[in-house]
Amino acid sequence: MRFECSHFPLFLIILTCHISPLKSSQNYQWSYDSDVFGGPHFWGLVEKDWWMCKKGRLQSPIDIQPDRLLFDASVKPVSYAELNFFLIIYLTISLKLMRYIFTCAHLFACNKKLGTWNRIFGANIAKFRAWVVYIIIFHAQVPQLQVVSEFVNTGQMVRVRIGYSSKKPSVNITSGPLYGYRYRVQRIDFHMGRKNENGSEHTINGRRFPMEVQLVAYNTDLYPNFTSASKSPHGIAILSVLVDFGPETNQELIKLTIATASISYKDQRVQLADFEPWRLLPFTRDIITYEGSLTSPGCHETVTWIILNQPIFIKKEHFEEWSHLYLSMEGAEKVPVAPNFRKIQETNNRLVRTNIQHKVWIFLS
């Protein structure tokens, strides 16, 4: 019996022809594009350290189904700690000032001789206090609240890299479903669709949103750096914010939208002088959480996902400006970064928990 194997070298030649142009002309190693070598279907094959992408059973993202969520009273709202010495002093002074103003206002309101003050504050003392809190907490422009950051086009996505120094606050996540550990935000990743497409990674009842903002943090209580934490138990926490279309754009998203013009091509980067990452977060205490994985190679199943149950918004004209981002180098053929999301993974009977007691889903409105 005779076996003909002459087709095998031809297969190698064809495969080589497909791989080489990818690395030379596109100039990237892995991609969210399922139609190319290096796309999600190949993640678990091309690198031995990425085997979890193919065989893992706790993979992300997933579809969030509200009627299957498990209410868990032990899941507390997430706390955001951005405190350093200067910020502690600032907040201490602010609280003392608030107490002083409240006391003075109350005295003015109760003193009948001061009729004008009584008319102003007497019936509206609660509103006055709320107004002062709003001014001090949400409108105070304090340099210490800004972090050192860099906006970069990695070739697979655009990302904000957070830098740290003794004179700037660290951005930390704690409480919630994190078992008391403190996680430091290392970067903020942006997943999106093209002009007329939605590109969030997580979906709600099958609905995909235009964009998803992911604050990626590592456990500083257990691990010395992000790399070791990403491969270790309880190593990573990702705070996910879905972005929907609306009449107004979130203020920090406006800053980033303007900055995208400076990072159109792979490896381009720009410093963000006044970036405040916590302003990307909506005002909500409602969260959804589950144990999953990174959504990029090597898909390590070390992530506690925390999805906020309220979106932030972006105007369509601002969203379209993000479509001028390319995964190719400047001067090469323009290949858009978007869409850059991983497909939905199987839940595999995982518990998806929430602290929401009522059946009001802002995502579904």
From Swiss-Prot:
Principal location listed in the UniProt entry: secreted
Gene3D superfamilies: Alpha carbonic anhydrase
Residues involved in substrate binding: T295, S296
Keyword entries, A-Z: Secreted, Signal
CDD domains in the cross-refs: alpha_CARP_X_XI_like
GO MF entry, a single one: carbonate dehydratase activity
GO cellular component terms listed in the entry, alphabetical order: extracellular region
Active site (UniProt): Y223
Domain of life: Eukaryota
TM spans (from-to): none
Subcellular location: Secreted
Pfam families in alphabetical order: Carb_anhydrase
Domain Alpha-carbonic anhydrase intervals: 28-356
Family of the protein in this entry: Belongs to the alpha-carbonic anhydrase family.
Protein name: Putative carbonic anhydrase-like protein 1
Organism this protein belongs to: Caenorhabditis elegans
